[in-house]
Each structure stands twice: as C-alpha cells, then as structure tokens.
Amino acid sequence: MAKGKKNWVFCDGYLPPHGDNPEFEGHEALMMTNLTGKVANISLTFIFEDKDPVVIDGITLDAMRTTCIRLDHPLGKDGFMLGESVQYTIWVKSSTPICACFGRLDVRQTNMAYYSVEGYTF
C-alpha cells in the first residue's frame, strides 16, 4: 500500500505581512516527507486569483527523507517570490507518493498564531 499521495492541493495560501516586532518572522511553509524507497521528483504549481499559474520544477526529495520549503523565501532557479497578502493555491505533484502539510505563522498580533493543515489529496 502506498504511503502518501502523488497530488496534494493546499487552497489557503496567503503569506501574512510582517508584524511590528522584527524579531519574529511571519511565514508560510510546505513540509513534505517521502516514506518510499524511491526519489520523489516534485513540482509546485502556484495558482492565483488574478494571474497565470507559476510552476516551480526540479525539486527532489530523497527516499525516507523530509524537507521544509519556506514560502517567504525565493523559490526555484529563477528565485520566484510570492509576495505578501496574495491569495494563492499550491498544487504539489510528485513522481512517487509523499506526505505533505502546509503551515502558517502569523505574527501580526502579540498572541502569534501557527497552524498546519493537511491538503486535499488524489
């Protein structure tokens, strides 16, 4: 039985702006784990409300490894930046089944909020 799925969709992307305290970095992150014995070749498709999708290819995740991709940092070989306060969806496509979750740390209030969610899989 496969451990994970090849397609994951996370619909609630919205990189929060930075708060007033420079010591804390608000961010979003995509965490992926490969529980198989094969390397996973992964692409990320960012889907927006008002512009064409952006595809980031060339992500590899070795067998029995995990990774965390910070979405507030440059992505891919071209250094694509999401930008703050932009609504988006991430479609994760993998050559082999993986597990994935999405997390957000919002630091705009003193009682910072972090949450993670499992995406829709198929």
Residue map of PLM features:
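Gly/Pro-rich, tryptophan- and cysteine-flecked surface segments typical
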Residues: 1-122
